UniProtKB/Swiss-Prot annotation:
This is Putative 2Fe-2S ferredoxin. The keyword Lipoprotein does not apply. Ferredoxins are iron-sulfur proteins that transfer electrons in a wide variety of metabolic reactions. Belongs to the 2Fe2S Shethna-type ferredoxin family. One of its GO terms (molecular function) is 2 iron, 2 sulfur cluster binding. Binds 1 [2Fe-2S] cluster. It comes from Priestia megaterium. Gene3D superfamilies: Glutaredoxin. InterPro entries: Thioredoxin-like_sf. [2Fe-2S] cluster binds at C23, C54, C58.
Length: 127
């Protein structure tokens, strides 16, 4: 079995695209292909690396996370996927209306007026 090891020197963005079962039922494969195809179309292959994974936000499926900015996008349709590549990765502007979380140097925060669910706390109380 061959294992791929990418040389990521010079990579500017890493996009984690959710391909867990909930996301796949809600268009995760289409979102993945839309992002990858638009990256190729705009000749951004050397600047953008994509990874299929599970991001643990099933209620917001499908989800894509862009680093290094730390922006989490919800309900990524093919149209939103194209906009992520064109406006965020190529243009440097987040899609505020599609954000679940953004990073503010103190940690992840939900944008104002977000309609996304809060989710389960990662730290369990000792109650």
């Amino acid at each position: 079995m061959s294992v791929t090891t990418w040389n990521l020197n010079g990579t500017k963005h890493h996009v984690l695209i959710c391909n867990g079962s909930s996301c796949m039922r809600k268009g995760g494969e289409e979102a993945t292909q839309a992002i990858r195809n638009k990256v190729a179309e705009l000749n951004l292959d050397e600047a953008v690396h994509t990874t299929r994974t599970c991001n643990g936000r099933c209620k917001d499926a499908p989800v894509a996370i862009v680093y290094p900015s730390g922006d989490w996008y919800k309900q990524v349709t093919e149209k939103v996927a194209h906009r992520i590549v064109e406006e965020h990765l190529a243009g440097g502007c987040s899609l505020k209306e599609s954000l679940i979380y953004e990073y503010d140097q103190k940690g992840f925060v939900s944008p104002e007026n977000s309609d996304s669910i809060e989710g389960i706390d990662k730290v369990k109380s000792n109650a």
